[in-house]
Regions:
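N-terminal export leaders
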Residues: 3-7
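Bacterial N-terminal signal peptides
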Residues: 10-18
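Short, glycine-/small- and polar/acidic-enriched structural segments
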Residues: 27-177, 181-187, 201-206, 211-212
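Pocket-lining segment of extracytoplasmic ligand-binding domains
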Residues: 92, 170-261
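Ligand-binding clefts/hinges and TM-proximal coupling segments of bilobed small-molecule sensing domains
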Residues: 142-158, 238-270, 312-314, 323-329
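Secondary-structure end/capping motifs
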Residues: 226-307
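Conserved C-terminal helix/tail region of periplasmic/extracytoplasmic solute-binding proteins
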Residues: 297-336
Length: 336
């Protein structure tokens, strides 16, 4: 009995220590609300779910609630209002919000390269065939609108030469029904659409058309970062760790993507292969100065930011938070 008591007592002390320090107790984790721009997520957006499912968030001391929305603009608005602690949105839209003094900054860009395609119906064979066609967008200034106008500009087609048609976030049904002639689809959406209608085809891969404009950027409110810097350092570090996990653990990543993106495993696997081949996901902070400045300048060029309101790199990026977050994580060469 005496020997058993000696064994149990240290165990109880250790258990109490774990509760005191937070190890092994979810009560000690820092709560954080994170917004994702699509419902359900696409494969490219799966990073926070990977961080949650693999325990990376917990390792960093975070208890993250992931909420989904019907577009990146809604995420940005909820971060600005304070309803969300952080979330992911289009890098260009974030630049516009920063120019309007919204009080936000970028933490990391888990997917700095576009993961989208301009998928078109069979009546469009070449870029000039876009003239007079119905271009599917969610709302003016939204992700699909920005990318569609980007493609038109590259092809020398004026906005007034096409018809912009507002649709819901789910682009595939109206494309299949002929309500629109084009849709901005992520690679997994494109594969699903082509299985239903083989005549649909990809006119543009945006990671090739515009490799320097930032795509999926995680933002947070400046006031919240100033009040709780450690919380946001943990988030940034966890997301970078999740990206690195994904590059070296295909099977688990595909499993998580299939579960949360509600995809057949083979489509999730095909999307994974396309995204990793194109290096769409970053392995560092993803916020290279040249790409941040390119994104800002692009928004000035298209008239979404007035020249006298143009933000600087330092206005866009939460530099001190990122620097502290990534201490001890060696930079991966040849990746953003």
């Amino acid at each position: 009995m005496h020997r058993r008591s000696l064994v149990v007592l240290p165990a109880l002390l250790l258990a109490g220590l774990a509760l005191w320090t937070g190890r092994g107790s979810t009560q000690q984790l820092i709560k954080l609300k994170f917004g994702n721009p699509t419902t359900p997520p696409n494969t490219v957006h799966i990073i926070p779910w990977v961080a949650k499912e693999t325990g990376i968030f917990a390792e960093e001391g975070l208890d993250v609630e992931i909420l989904t929305f019907e577009g990146g603009l809604y995420v940005i608005r909820n971060v600005v209002s304070g309803a969300l602690d952080a979330g992911g949105g289009p890098g260009a839209s974030i630049a516009v919000s920063i120019a309007r003094k919204a009080g936000i900054k970028a933490l990391v860009s888990p997917a700095p390269r576009f993961a989208s395609t301009l998928t078109v119906r069979s009546n469009i064979k070449k870029p000039e065939d876009l003239k007079g066609k119905k271009i599917g967008i969610q709302e003016v200034g939204g992700f699909a609108d920005i990318l569609s106008r980007m493609a038109l500009r590259k092809f020398g087609i004026k906005p007034e030469e096409v018809n912009f048609v507002p649709i819901a976030s789910a682009d595939v049904p109206p494309l299949l029904a002929g309500a629109i002639d084009t849709a901005i689809l992520h690679v997994d959406q494109m594969e699903i659409a082509r299985r239903k209608e083989p005549s649909l085809h990809t006119l543009v891969k945006f990671w090739e058309l515009e490799p320097n404009q930032l795509f999926y950027v995680v933002l947070a409110q400046e006031k919240k970062m100033a009040a709780e810097p450690v919380k946001f350092q943990k988030l940034a570090r966890a997301l970078v760790k999740a990206n690195r996990f994904m590059y070296t653990n295909k099977a688990k990543t595909v499993e998580i993507a299939a579960k949360y993106a509600q995809l057949p495993p083979d489509i999730a696997a095909a999307a994974y292969d396309e995204l990793t081949r194109a290096k769409v996901w970053s392995q560092n902070d993803g916020l290279r100065r040249d790409k941040v400045e390119y994104t800002i300048n692009r928004m000035v060029q298209v008239g979404n930011i007035k020249p006298d309101a143009k933000p600087k790199y330092e206005d866009y990026v939460a530099g001190p938070i990122i620097e502290e977050a990534l201490k001890g994580l060696p930079r991966i060469p040849d990746f953003d």
